From Swiss-Prot:
It comes from Bordetella bronchiseptica (strain ATCC BAA-588 / NCTC 13252 / RB50) (Alcaligenes bronchisepticus). Gene3D superfamilies: 2.40.50.100, 2.40.50.150, 3.90.1100.10, 6.10.140.1670, DNA-directed RNA polymerase, beta subunit, external 1 domain, DNA-directed RNA polymerase, subunit 2, domain 6, RNA polymerase alpha subunit dimerisation domain, RNA polymerase Rpb2, domain 2. It comes from the Bacteria. The lineage of its organism: Bacteria, Pseudomonadati, Pseudomonadota, Betaproteobacteria, Burkholderiales. Keywords: DNA-directed RNA polymerase, Nucleotidyltransferase, Transcription, Transferase. This is DNA-directed RNA polymerase subunit beta. One of its GO terms (cellular component) is DNA-directed RNA polymerase complex. One of its GO terms (biological process) is DNA-templated transcription.
């Protein structure tokens, strides 16, 4: 495979044993695809499918008025262009959204005519609110912040059968139940009680016998019994009767009388059990009917009503038990043939018959009234109301919707095939079939459903969630429209008078702004963004709650394989409820997760890839990805490890249907980034996956020496890097932008053949980390579509780089790495390896107050000159100023209310003038504990307020940048066009031209070069055709210029119009500070294997343990952190990292040699490194220059990829170590024979340690838990209102709680004065603490403790219990 522009520069050596059959799919496809389908913005109206907005509109419209004389029909909708782009929305705090306009038609019918005739039709476009748009990276900008809508994993609509696991009844009897869950509408439950009577309930209300529901849908007791039971046929005799003999019904029963054959020979004696031999004898005897005694009939249940043939009178009802009197009545009425229900105790229970007895309703109407009373207790049941309610429950499309998924699940569970054909409401057949399946379950046939099976849980994505909200808004609109439609004809209203878009906007706004599933995007680094968008949550509206979710829901299920990651999930209360999609997983049309498999055709593994959902997968036998194959793709082993229906087994290759696509198929993105994951304990892998998302981007990102090969995919798919949209040549590069002249073949005619990529510079992320893009191409480079042009935060040459590669030694060091502490060399800090930039946004607003407007100004009294020096004339800090806590950033004064003045103040005012004191200083200052550099200032001014100088200069800068972009585009377009014109003109004959060009002369290059290029258009060509082409070229150039001028004007208009600010705000100023955070003790760090720790000390380089050649270790870790935690992956990573670095050193040595032989020797060595083991790299496809550039990039270490579950073996690591450290080098560095340990020396004494130490390189991360954010101290500060105790927490500038255990400690030491001070003046003794403060100021250190306020609170609380408690004061 050919390498891309960036891959060539640094090829990652992979240890994978298998070729990739399928590339990792685009990681944000689920989100983007779902929202695209929801909007269908670029689809022609006629081609739109019934999904998303289209579905919502067509389900609500047409809206018909109450009298049916007017209706509002939906025609189509269109989305407008958003006013501001993503970046502008973020700056201005706006929502990135498009206006939605729907074309609706108002149809009025003629009242005068008997049959419906249309009187008039009015069509109009109506504004329906704003619909937020998704950015290219799958997030939304809502009120200026980036948010993500997390997908929800909920229980799929359909029918489910389960039992209570014997928990309800003390006997431990299994009570079966069924539940029909629609997408929207009432839930219908069926359940058995301990007495085996079957009940139903609607929406978890009071339960009623199920036969009420059956009667309500139009069944009679006879038809109910006929539906659920088989019958026994009897012919009555004067004594006893004859029974039709059905052999299988007698097997295993006790004979209650002698059974004889035709000749009267007794085959089964009384009280004997009937076995198979007896039945064979009876069949051989040709017995069709058996004579039964009278008492055999008693207790049987009639299947049908018994009617007297003469009088028509009902002698006995269906479901009546046969007694002596009933038999006599039937004989008296000359009834000969009767049918009874066939039941037994084993697998034909009489449940429906018993239920029918418990049901007291007589007919269909009575049954429906009973249901009405249950649903609407206390309301009088009129016939219309009863009918309407019953229809609305399950049969009306407005109130009940199974959805396609629900219909498909119902059909497949009730055994009607897997398609979604059928009505979207419930049918009588559905209800009957469900009850039938439930009764069969109770009879011991069939299986209950597993709720946690991924075939019974589906994913609702952004599009679907947004559609539901939009529909909810439309329903509110529908009610209002129905009211007004009646007036439409009388008042001559237009559609826009009827529709109010507020409810829609409100519903959408509420969903995107404050829904549980709309989350503030985790933007610490590219991985956290991508993981957040691939997250699947079981919480949220219509989902589970943390408190109610049991162990089963959270547990890993066999169907998670390849669909949901078994590793990555949060620790804590949400464990197992929030999951991450697996690497290759995708959603099918019904919203079920699918995973890809390779199909096996005739015993051969093909490259055909099929996606299977959890339900489909259960029908196949699937081999693992690491099964050994021969060259033809046949299995080598006689027995292959496979999975079938969740069970693992060994089977013959002939039985296998599919094979996994890749070993990393089962894990998520974050877990697939952990090298040697297969050697880590799952708990630690979970922590590793979670902590990578918290890694802070370093100042200089460094690729991991040991990766897994997924790094490039993550970096590119996350959108942090800049990718070329079209191939071409780099025309211009600077730190801010990359300009590319597009290849002719990729350019569309009439478009500008220039792509300009403006890079994001020092921008704040949601977590205050720094997003900054750096170009990695040079002028003149040829790039192809999709190549990486610029690195973003945490990426290095287009690969994810979350941390730094550190030289790590595993050894104890003076207790400084006790309990996971980390000892770090000062060199790491000096080299800024873990320095990160954090950007803080500070905002100040100038409001219009009752006493007058606040003013942004430099003119502030009582401010030192040093403070004012940083402010410009407008009172705003300069960019580049270095500021620390309490420095003024923006000067602001607020008018102060008039106060009563003392005579002295009046005198002073009279002498020194009025002005100074009627305003107070409310400037924006740097918060405590923060120092940094001002990197950007933005000023927003309300429409109609005069801009200050600073705001104007910001706008001018922005316009200058934009003009430069346009000029670049124009320059390239013009050069391009003039090159083509020159080619056409040279050698052509002319009729004349500038500089007295003679008629008939031929044009030369020299002549054209002398002219100004715009004068070329004045040349009169002899050939008419060419003259036309020349004229067209001139027109097209002038048109382009005009287009660019228009674009500039548009931009200028946008920038100079006033900003939309909250009511009452005149100006808003945002100041951005860049804060440099160096590594310091107290910062949390971690590797990728869950090996986390806190920096305990930063030690001078000279004190660190060092190697024989003087190389000091960067980090010293405690070896005891490895064995008990079972994350051995970190040790293997260290070994492989050591090899990677060593190979880099060898390459560097070669490059130091003479230039000539370099390429050849380097090429030979690289072949050895890349192609001895693992998958091969195509070094031979590179030119000598490319090989040398590659070698130069590899000097600091060759990056290795050891894919998850398919990584480097111990043997391969050993081979690499030998390549990296030949014997002479190993001896010089005093490495052990295996090269995996080295003899180290104590930096302080120079002595050798007593045993060799494991040393090597590990990719180590600095996490977002920085001590700077947590460090906090309080002198005096705010107090709680009721208890008057100091508040807690850094945000409230609170104190540290002196809790009861601390009090015990002081009591134990007898430190009574300290204790008194803690509980009174330092806490809630109001008078005491003011007194102490005064005393300290005077230099008098005495405390005078009084009554703590919380004691008064206690007294008040006791009084509230009506106990009058008072203190005796002496």
């Amino acid at each position: 495979m050919p390498y891309s522009y960036t891959e060539k520069k640094r090829i990652r050596k992979s240890f994978a044993k298998r070729e990739d059959v399928q590339n990792v799919p685009f990681l944000l496809a689920t989100q983007l695809q779902s929202y695209l389908t929801f909007l269908q913005a670029d689809t022609a109206t006629s081609d739109r499918v019934n999904e998303g907005l289209q579905a919502a509109f067509s389900s609500i419209f047409p809206i018909v008025s109450h009298n049916g004389m007017a209706r509002l029909e939906f025609v189509s909708y269109a989305l407008g262009e958003p006013v501001f782009d993503v970046k502008e929305c973020q700056q201005r705090g706006l929502t990135y959204a498009s206006p939605l306009r729907a074309k609706v038609r108002l149809v009025l019918l003629d009242r005068e005519v008997s049959k419906p005739t249309i009187k008039e039709v009015k069509e109009q476009e109506v504004y329906m609110g704003e619909i937020p748009l998704m950015t290219g990276t799958g997030s939304f900008v809502i009120n200026g912040t980036e948010r993500v809508i997390v997908s929800q994993l909920h229980r799929s609509p359909g029918v489910f059968f389960e039992h209570d696991r014997g928990k309800t009844h003390s006997s431990g009897k299994l009570l079966f139940s069924a539940r029909v869950i629609p997408y929207r509408g009432s839930w219908l439950d069926f359940e058995f009680d301990p007495k085996d009577v079957l009940f139903f309930r609607v929406d978890r209300r009071r339960k009623m016998p199920v036969t009420i529901l059956l009667k309500a849908i139009g069944m009679t007791p006879e038809s109910i019994l006929a539906h659920f039971f088989d019958f026994d046929n009897f012919e009555l005799k004067s004594e006893g009767g004859m029974m039709e003999f059905v052999a299988e019904r007698w097997k295993g029963e006790m004979a209650r009388f002698d059974i004889a054959d035709r000749d009267g020979k007794v085959i089964v004696e009384k009280d004997k059990r009937i076995n198979a031999k007896h039945l064979r004898d009876l069949a051989a005897g040709g017995i069709q009917r058996v004579s039964v005694p009278e008492d055999f009939l008693y207790g049987r249940v009639l299947a049908k009503n018994i009617v007297d043939p003469d009088t028509g009178e009902v002698v006995a009802h269906a479901n009546d038990e046969i007694t002596e009197s009933v038999l006599n009545a039937m004989r008296a009425a000359n009834v000969r043939d009767i049918q009874t229900l066939y039941t037994n105790d084993l697998d034909r229970g009489p449940y429906i018959s018993q239920t029918l007895r418990a049901d007291e309703t007589a007919d269909q109407m009575a049954a429906r009234v009973a249901i009405y009373r249950m649903m609407r207790p206390g309301e009088p049941p009129t016939e219309e109301a009863v009918e309407a309610l019953f229809q609305r429950l399950f049969y009306s499309e407005e109130t009940y919707d199974l959805s396609r998924v629900g219909r498909m699940k119902v059909n497949s569970r009730l055994g009607r095939g897997d398609d979604s054909t059928g009505p979207m409401t419930l049918t009588n057949e559905d209800i009957l079939e469900t009850i039938k399946v439930l009764v069969e379950l109770r009879n011991g046939r069939g299986q209950i459903d597993d709720i946690d099976h991924l075939g019974n849980r589906r994913v609702r994505c952004v599009g679907e969630l947004a559609e539901n909200q939009f529909r909810a808004g439309l329903v509110r609109v529908e009610r209002a429209v129905k009211e007004r439609l009646g007036q439409a004809e009388t008042e001559n209203l237009m559609p826009h008078d009827l529709i109010n878009s507020k409810p829609i906007s409100a519903a959408i706004k509420e969903f995107f702004g404050s829904s549980q599933l709309s989350q503030f995007m985790d933007q610490t680094n590219p991985l956290s963004e991508i993981t957040h968008k691939r997250r699947v949550s079981a919480l949220g509206p219509g989902g589970l709650t943390r408190e109610r979710a049991g162990f089963e829901v959270r547990d890993v299920h066999p169907t998670h394989y390849g669909r949901v990651c078994p590793i990555e999930t949060p620790e804590g209360p949400n464990i197992g409820l929030i999951n991450s999609m697996a690497l290759y997983a995708r959603l099918n049309e019904y919203g079920f997760l699918e995973t890809p498999y390779r199909k096996i055709i005739d015993g051969k593994v093909s490259d055909q890839i099929d996606y299977l959902s959890a339900i489909e997968e259960s029908h196949y036998v699937i081999a693992q990805a690491n099964a050994a194959l021969d060259d033809e793709g046949r299995f080598v082993d006689d027995l292959v490890a496979c999975r079938e229906a969740g069970e693992t087994m060994l089977t013959a290759p002939g039985n296998v249907h599919y094979m996994d696509v890749a070993p990393s198929q089962i894990v998520s993105v974050a877990a697939s980034l952990i090298p040697f994951l297969e050697h880590d304990d799952a708990n630690r892998a979970l922590m590793g996956a979670n902590m990578q998302r918290q890694a802070v981007p370093c100042l200089r990102p460094e690729k991991p020496l040991v990766g897994t090969g997924v790094e490039r995919t993550v970096a590119v798919d996350s959108g942090t890097t800049v990718q070329a949209l079209r191939g071409g040549v780099v025309d211009h590069v600077d730190a801010d932008r990359v300009v590319i002249r597009v290849n002719d073949e990729e350019n569309v005619a009439g478009e500008v053949g220039v792509d300009i990529y403006n890079l994001i510079k020092y921008t704040r992320s949601n977590q205050n980390t720094n997003i900054n893009q750096r170009p990695i191409v040079a002028r003149g480079d040829k790039v192809a579509k999709g190549d990486v042009l610029a690195d973003g935060a945490s990426t290095d040459l287009g690969e994810l780089a979350l941390g730094q590669n550190m030289l790590i030694a595993f050894m104890p060091w003076n207790g400084y790495n006790f309990e996971d502490s980390i000892l770090i060399s000062e060199r790491v800090v000096a080299d800024d390896r873990y320095t990160s930039i954090h950007i803080e946004e500070l905002t100040v607003v100038a409001r219009d107050t009752k006493l007058g407007p606040e003013e942004i100004t430099r003119d502030i009294s009582n401010l030192a000159e040093t403070q004012l020096n940083r402010l410009d004339d407008s009172g705003i800090v300069y960019i580049g100023a270095e500021v620390s806590a309490d420095d003024v950033l923006v000067g602001k004064v607020t008018p102060k209310g008039e106060t009563q003045l003392t005579p002295e103040e009046k005198l002073l005012r009279a002498i020194f003038g009025e002005k100074a004191s009627d305003v107070k200083d409310t400037s924006l200052r740097v918060p405590s504990g923060m120092t940094g550099t001002v990197i950007d200032v933005q000023v927003f001014t309300r429409e109609g307020i005069v801009r200050d100088k600073r705001a104007q200069s910001i706008i001018d800068d922005e316009l200058r940048r934009y003009r430069q972009d346009l000029n670049d585009q124009l320059r390239i377009v013009e050069n391009d066009q003039f090159d083509r014109i020159e080619k056409m003109l040279v050698g052509k004959a002319v009729n004349g031209g500038p500089r007295k060009l003679a008629k008939g002369a031929t044009l030369t290059k020299a002549y054209l070069a002398d002219l100004d290029r715009w004068q070329w258009f004045d040349i009169r060509l002899a050939d008419e055709q060419h003259a036309v082409v020349l004229e067209q070229a001139k027109e097209s150039l002038e048109q382009k210029r005009h287009q660019f001028d228009l674009a500039f004007e548009e931009k200028r208009k946008k920038l100079t119009q006033g900003d939309e600010l909250p009511p009452g705000v005149l100006k808003m100023i945002k100041v951005y500070l860049a804060v440099k955070r160096r590594l310091q003790p107290g910062d949390k760090m971690a590797g990728r294997h869950g090996n986390k720790g806190v920096v305990s000390r930063i030690t001078p380089v000279e004190d660190m343990p060092h190697m024989a050649d003087g190389t000091p270790a960067d980090i010293v870790l405690n070896p005891l952190g490895v064995p008990s935690r079972m994350n051995v992956g970190q040790v293997l990573e260290v070994h492989l990292g050591w090899a990677a670095k060593g190979v880099g050193y060898r390459i560097a040595d070669m490059l130091r040699d003479e230039r000539t032989a370099q390429a050849k020797s380097v090429r030979g060595y690289l072949e050895k490194v890349y192609n001895t083991t693992g998958s091969s790299a195509h070094i031979d496809s590179l030119t000598d220059e490319e090989v040398l550039e590659l070698a130069n990039n590899l000097k600091k270490g060759v990056p290795f990829a050891t894919p998850v579950f398919d990584g480097a073996t111990e043997e391969e690591i050993g081979k690499m170590l030998e390549l990296a450290y030949p014997d002479d080098v190993a001896a010089r560095m005093r490495l052990t024979a295996s090269r995996s340990q080295a003899w180290l020396y104590d930096g302080r004494t120079g002595e050798q340690f007593e045993r060799p130490v494991t040393i090597g390189y590990m990719h180590y991360l600095k996490l977002h838990h920085l001590v700077d954010d947590k460090m906090h101290a309080r002198s005096t500060g705010p107090y709680s209102l009721v208890t008057q105790q100091p508040l807690g927490g850094k945000a409230q500038f609170g104190g540290q709680r002196f809790g009861e255990m601390e009090v015990w400690a002081l009591e134990a030491y007898g430190a009574s004065y300290t204790l008194q001070e803690m509980l009174t003046v330092k806490s809630d003794d109001i008078t005491g603490r003011t007194k102490v403060y005064e005393n300290i100021v005077k230099g008098d250190h005495v405390i005078d403790a009084g009554m703590p306020e919380s004691f008064n609170v206690l007294v008040k609380e006791i009084r509230s219990l009506a106990l009058d408690m008072d203190l005796e004061r002496n």
